[in-house]
Amino acid sequence: FIIMEDAVLDLAVQEAMMSRLLFAGQVCCGSKRFLVHRDCVDAFVAKLTDALKQVKMGDPKDPTTTMGCLISEKAAMEVESQVAYTVEQGATLAYGGHRNGAFFEPTILTDVTPQMDVARDLEVFGPVFSIIPVASAGEAVQVANASRYGLSGAVFSENSKTALSIAERLDTATVVINGGTDYRPPELSFGGYKKSGIGREGVSRTLDE
């Protein structure tokens, strides 16, 4: 999930929320890493924090609930352990981080560096936003590709040439421009690169086969 300095931050926050909090973050194509340009990272984190404060955890059958629990207490404990491990590596727990049984509150980790496990191959299946500052589009691509996974991604920029240039260089099967990674239209095939899978699935691909 790449956010360039000219991105519309309100839109980026809105889509980040959907991409990360859908099913409490337990989605294979949910955004795990948020690569944000240094010129707007503070503003993005501030807006994201305000948005997360409005999240209401509870019973999914309650219409006022906006996020449910994880699949089990064991899963929530694993997320808790991963957050603590990332903080031990030098990240800052900027918001959240608390577990209550199988519930884990939306969490923001800042000061995440490309060398940390969570910035590379540690997949957190929970509502955790790992914020990785980048200085340029080139650095964003480099950090994004330094992972053994490549299922889905997103690029936010008001410059379509910049966004498409970044998207074309990503080792990711699906890239959405100015939209979240939860977007999966049925007419397009779905699949991954590297450890995210081989081949494609979906209605259009099935008909082709």
Region locations from a protein language model:
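ALDH superfamily catalytic-core signature
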Residues: F1-P114, G138, Q142-V143, I177
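Conserved C-terminal structural/oligomerization subdomain of aldehyde/semialdehyde dehydrogenase
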Residues: I2, A7, K56, Q89, ...
